[in-house]
Design a protein with these regions (language model features):
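Short polybasic/polar patches that bind polyanions
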Residues: 77, 91, 122
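Major-groove DNA-recognition helix of helix-turn-helix-type DNA-binding domains
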Residues: 83-103
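Polyanion-binding surface elements
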Residues: 65-86
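Residue-level detector of functional hotspots within protein domains
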Residues: 80, 93, 112
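Arg/Lys-rich, alpha-helical DNA-contact motif
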Residues: 1-71, 109-188
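Minor-groove-contacting beta-hairpin "wing" of winged helix-turn-helix DNA-binding domains
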Residues: 103-109
Length: 188
């Protein structure tokens, strides 16, 4: 029904299925419970990223707004984000950075807030496309539902991004794993 590929979840499920096929139901039940625990961690991370995003957008921690302009290396160090990630996020349209006359990028306090949001969502395994979709919706409607924006690809999105419904996918995977756990218990 649904496949969640992140953080080795698929491999764990395959291992559990093989273990069950060998009729080692006790080990298979242990594996499915580990899988469920990891799904719960992933869901918690996804929800936490949404909470952090709401907090940043609500103005909590706006002290960054008064910082002087920073260069890429300074931003990288301040936010513990690699310079490659900053370049990647810029190339993928998540961030548009101003430049000085000499061509150096300069990051504003607003840019830092946006980067904190992107970092939180990426750490929770949201795709670049989901983040871009959410940022676009928020720029048009600051009151937009963050969870819905992250979890609802548009009809124009590619087939790859249709699989980008992280919270929905994790919820479906959890539901399926509980069903499998019940079946394994019955088979035991």
């Amino acid at each position: 029904e649904i496949e969640v590929l992140q953080n080795g979840l698929r491999k764990k499920m395959i291992r559990m299925v093989k273990t069950a096929a060998e009729r080692d139901f006790d080990s298979a039940i242990t594996l499915i419970r580990e899988y469920l625990a990891q799904i719960d961690q992933e869901r918690h991370g996804a929800e936490e990223a949404i909470r952090i995003t709401r907090q940043i957008l609500s103005g909590a921690g706006q002290s960054d707004a008064f910082l002087p302009y920073l260069r890429r290396r300074e931003v990288s160090e301040a936010l513990d984000i690699s310079m490659d990630a900053l370049r990647n996020w810029e190339m993928n349209g998540l961030l548009s950075v101003k430049r000085k006359a000499n061509g150096y990028r300069i990051y504003t306090g607003e840019d830092l807030q946006r980067l904190k949001i992107i970092r939180a969502l990426r750490c929770a395994n949201y795709s670049l496309e989901a983040i871009l979709r959410m940022l676009g919706e928020l720029s048009q409607d600051p009151e937009a539902d963050i969870r819905k924006a992250l979890d609802t690809p548009s009809r124009d999105d590619t087939i790859i991004s249709v699989c980008d419904k992280l919270i929905s996918s994790l919820n479906a995977a959890h539901k399926n794993a509980v069903l499998i756990e019940n079946m394994l218990t019955d088979m035991k």
